[in-house]
Amino acid sequence: MKLLYTDIRTSLTEILTREAEELVAAGKRVFYIAPNSLSFEKERAVLECLSQQASFSITVTRFAQMARYLVLNDLPAKTILDDIGLGLAFYKCLAELNPKDLRVYGAIKQDPQLIQQLIELYHEMTKSQMNFLDLENLTDEDKRADLLLIFEKVTAYLNQGQLAQGSQLSHLIEAIENDKVSSDFNQIALVIDGFTRFSAEEERVVDLLHGKGVEIVIGAYASKKAYTSPFSEGNLYQASVKFLHHLASKYQTPAQDCSQTHEKMDSFDKASRLLESSYDFSELALDVDEKDRENLQIWSCLTQKEELELVARSIRQKLHENSDLSYKHFRILLGDVASYQLSLKTIFDQYQIPFYLGRSEAMAHHPLTQFVESILALKRYRFRQEDLINLLRTDLYTDLSQSDIDAFEQYIRYLGINGLPAFQQTFTKSHHGKFNLERLNVLRLRILAPLETLFASRKQKAENLLQKWSVFLKEGAVTKQLQDLTTTLEAVEQERQAEVWKAFCHVLEQFATVFAGSQVSLEDFLALLHSGMSLSQYRTIPATVDTVLVQSYDLIAPLTADFVYAIGLTQDNLPKISQNTSLLTDEERQNLNQATEEGVQLLIASSENLKKNRYTMLSLVNSARKQLFLSAPSLFNESESKESAYLQELIHFGFRRREKRMNHKGLSKEDMGSYHSLLSSLVAYHQQGEMSDTEQDLTFVKVLSRVIGKKLDQQGLENPAIPTSPSSKTLAKDTLQALYPAKQEFYLSTSGLTEFYRNEYSYFLRYVLGLQEELRLHPDARSHGNFLHRIFERALQLPNEDSFDQRLEQAIQETSQEREFEAIYQESLEAQFTKEVLLDVARTTGHILRHNPAIETIKEEANFGGKDQAFIQLDNGRSVFVRGKVDRIDRLKANGAIGVVDYKSSLTQFQFPHFFNGLNSQLPTYLAALKREGEQNFFGAMYLEMAEPVQSLMAVKSLAGAVVEASKSMKYQGLFLEKESSYLGEFYNKNKANQLTDEEFQLLLDYNAYLYKKAAEKILAGRFAINPYTENGRSIAPYVQQHQAITGFEANYHLGQARFLEKLDLADGKRLVGEKLKQAWLEKIREELNR
């Protein structure tokens, strides 16, 4: 046993490679062992350090893979399960347990997260050399009983199926202990690099090999000052020093100092010594100069995106300045990989920098996993429509074109069908011939045939089920679709898809192994397959060595690359505090460690945090050979963040924080990194909205435009203007002539007017282009409204001989029997329930009509408008016509005054602010239209809410009080003529704010005509701005911005072009209510009309 340590600015790999070469010269076969996270990288580093650049006698590997290189004899032939197979085994065993048998985990026994935690605990106990029976020492009786039962069941199953238990390393330990290794230990040597602690399993291997006479060399980084210090607690090197002291004590071998004498202390050595001095409370006087600050830079950026752009520019600039540099000389370290992953790809592709993020990718979100999930959902939930649509959207099932899939989806959404029997029936319903039923039935059979065959499978042996699954994949064209998908992709993506397919096949192989000879139902098979795929991960290797490697900062080793950029070093990310998320608490781990024999040790993450994080920081500071950049954003994941305390310490030592910003207001030579990034910079420059007028900038932009123009001309493209915000074009004259011929009447409805003032472009989409909502055969808000309207229309038309309640019930019965409504509301139990709710609403609303003796209804569903009477006249002489339908017209019995009623499904009131801004013209339009038809005497226009009143019982003292409060909400809401209000009863909300004099009434009608005139002039001129209104000046309501995917309008970027609603100018800032508020708005209307 030989122990070595060296200062952190001397390459430990070089020293250990020399040791390995000496061992080879002595006739040894050397295994160069590196940690799992560094083995791939360490192999390249060792090859670079070898004097011959190669050696057949040195194998760079990991502890777990050593068994592959040793000859093991007479071991029983057992199949080894990986995490996927182990997960399936846990799933199978837990499925067989009764939930009542598990006191803690019974309700979640097949939850994927629980299974994942059980797998992790299984591995942890294996690595720590702990037996599952050791769990008897747990103090929590319920948890102890559950875990022992689960592991006992799984262990018995693995033994029964001749499936190997434990890890590869545990099998090697078993082989060495039982003398099953025929390799000559005297010819083997181990060189161990990069460790600061061994797991119990790794330490056991080292111990056994040492006992067999294997020469072992172990190296670590440590300063002589730290190693010889009697007190190491809190020291930066605490992790490595304790590791060396433990080994030195165990094997009675002092560690040798291999540190080299450096002619000059470099910037990173200086920073390391200052940090070490800070943590061991010793005094050290070192000056940090400008060269040090240049070599070790600390950046403060605004956002993560800005960080990545600055890094990309810096790399591009260095490559431009030094032709000897290549991408492999750069390394990027991330504070949080998940937060940077998406932006990293976007920005580095933009700057055309090849990179490799050495991280396994989960299959959970791959279309193949979604494909299996959709089939499982179809089986489990009995063929829901949504699950079938999700299956088709994966683009992996059947070889149907996208247009066929869209047509099929549109039709089944129209039908609203669910359940396999419904899909098996021939499609016969169509909406006025809109659907091609013949084609849709062909698609239906193509989609259903493979699924029907698969779903007919009963519980059977796993082997037979896999054969049926294979046939299904073939008949469903899944393999063909995957093949077609990959042929159109780039080489890197093709490799990625190939790895995904391998992972998918591996899950099936593990299933076949675990369930060999077992009876499995189709649903269980699909659930297991989905569970296995959700746990699966895949990874690709870089296509070329010359790439920028990207990794998490806590996996870095000293002296890794010439230039290192560590970004995202916020207080939350550096240091990383490991959290215990396993099934065993830290306290339980401590108790188990104390109760078991020496050498059996579960890791307690919280006890390792401090020494691990300090050593990581030391490695980070020394990761670069030439230049190191440490960066922290002020905003991390859209939340304010602070830079790490470690960075603040470096600043305290004399290193300088540099405020780094992307400057899009000016362009410089730094923007010439790559063609794509140059275009991006130009776009950002234009989007600033303010062009610099300096001669230098203007010249640069002109030259840049010419260069880009030539490049685009070579590609046969135009050089378009770069838009700064979504905009629309005015319609051409010939288009307007075709849409609105001069001799043809121009009609504008009240709903069209409201849509125009909500967003002019929405009016264009709906009323000019005719954009329609998806058709639905099932009842919706429109059909519910028609149903209630028809009931009241019929009830009020019936003779008055019978009581109102009798007439209402007769109207309900007759309307329910109408063919249209009978087809809708008898189709399903859900529709029948909806009908019952609507009938309750009808009976409740009838309360107002039943007890209102002051009025009589003279018309129902009355049409108004038409060619006979123009609504308004435009300045150019063209007439605008308005037509529509009034739900009901009432007449006062006292004097014959007319009132208009409009039914609403929710509480609706007339609001002067909305009316002024064109958003509430319905009632004034009805009154104006009737006035043009000869009516002169009005008592008002109002809304009637058709809904059951809801009253909170907490807000009232008694049930009688609840009835009183509920009746208050059941009133007509709207506008009333002051002179007629005395004739109206309690069912009318006729407060002062809702009452108008004759002059005020006419003022409203005049302003309403003005709103129609303004809208009509813009529509006939073909001008439709993208200007959704904003009520609060900060956001756009969802119902206003319904066509965002078409317009591209985003409130956070384009709020400036939204229409801000007009408001009252209140000089004293007092809030007006009631009559004063009405008068203020009427005055504003007068001012607007007098302009």
UniProtKB/Swiss-Prot annotation:
SUPFAM superfamilies: P-loop containing nucleoside triphosphate hydrolases, Restriction endonuclease-like. One of its GO terms (biological process) is double-strand break repair via homologous recombination. Keywords: ATP-binding, DNA damage, DNA repair, DNA-binding, Exonuclease, Helicase, Hydrolase, Nuclease, Nucleotide-binding. Its EC number is 3.1.-.-. One of its GO terms (molecular function) is hydrolase activity, acting on acid anhydrides. The keyword Acetylation does not apply. Pfam families: ADDB_N, PDDEXK_1. Its cofactor is Mg(2+). The keyword DNA-binding applies. The heterodimer acts as both an ATP-dependent DNA helicase and an ATP-dependent, dual-direction single-stranded exonuclease. Recognizes the chi site generating a DNA molecule suitable for the initiation of homologous recombination. This subunit has 5' -> 3' nuclease activity but not helicase activity. Despite having helicase-like domains, this subunit does not have helicase activity. Heterodimer of AddA and RexB. Belongs to the helicase family. AddB/RexB type 2 subfamily. This is ATP-dependent helicase/deoxyribonuclease subunit B. The gene is rexB.
